[in-house]
Amino acid sequence: MKDYRFGVLGAGNMGTAIVEGAVRAGLFRPDEALLFNRSAEKRDKNREKGYAVTDDYTRVYTTCETVLLAVKPQNFDEILPALATCQGEKPLVVSIAAGVTFAKMEAALGADTAIIRVMPNTPLMLGEGATQLVKNAAAAAEQLAQVRALFDTMGVTVVFEQERMLNEVIPYAGSAPAYLYMFADAMVQSAVRHGISGDDALTLFCQTMIGSARMMLQGDKTPAELIKAVCSPGGTTIEAMRVLEERGLYGILAEANDKCIARAYELGK
């Protein structure tokens, strides 16, 4: 039996948000989690919250039942060879690193290592994440269910059968918050030009995004049908839609998504 139920390599913003979400959901206690961070200041902060802390990432790998790899992708070339030298029973590995493939991790840790790749997005830090998961051949269905249950406490989850889908889905979840932030920024700038305060514009637009999202998720109409329902003939909205269509919004988004996906594949080489 391992000393800790859950370990985190890279207890930065996302890694810490995940472990804290699991603790809030009652999946384990803070003292059942071991967090690695090179920063003494961050280790002290996590220790004050009741977590066990360390500056030795091999200790996390050897003493935890499940290990979350939350370090930056460029740090894997340093960490994987060190973890490969660890002896004893292997943990369940959960990686949130974009572009670090099963093949790369298995080459270092062994093909018999149970690995689940997880792609969360930043709203997870507020408990509103959209997370995608896929398991390798060595991971059992029960292990996938265990990890999915963890991320279900922080938003919604989708499981894919094929690893490549984690690249294909990036524009619609992982990168999508930036799309929405850009759209919000453009709307606020436009509102300010028309004499509306930036704060008021942002409040109104954000609530409109929340309400519109709920209408899409909870209703029985498609996005296209909802657009049509708002666009009264000869009204104001249809004039705005005409400009967006003439300027090629759909084509612009399609090109942006294609570039995003292509870059994800490049990072995985």
Language-model region placement:
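Internal alpha-helical scaffold of NAD(P)-dependent oxidoreductase catalytic cores
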Residues: 104-114, 130-168, 179-218
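Rossmann-like NAD(P)(H) cofactor-binding subdomain of soluble oxidoreductases
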Residues: 34, 40, 49, 57-133, ...
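NAD(P)+-binding Rossmann beta1-loop-alpha1 motif at the extreme N-terminus of oxidoreductases
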Residues: 1-55, 59-61, 128, 192-194
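NAD(P)-dependent Rossmann-like dehydrogenase/reductase catalytic/cofactor-binding core
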Residues: 2, 206-269
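Small-residue helix-packing motif on alpha-helices
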Residues: 33, 43, 60, 197-204, ...
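Short pre-catalytic strand/loop immediately N-terminal to key active-site residues, enriched for Gly-Thr
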Residues: 165-171, 223-228
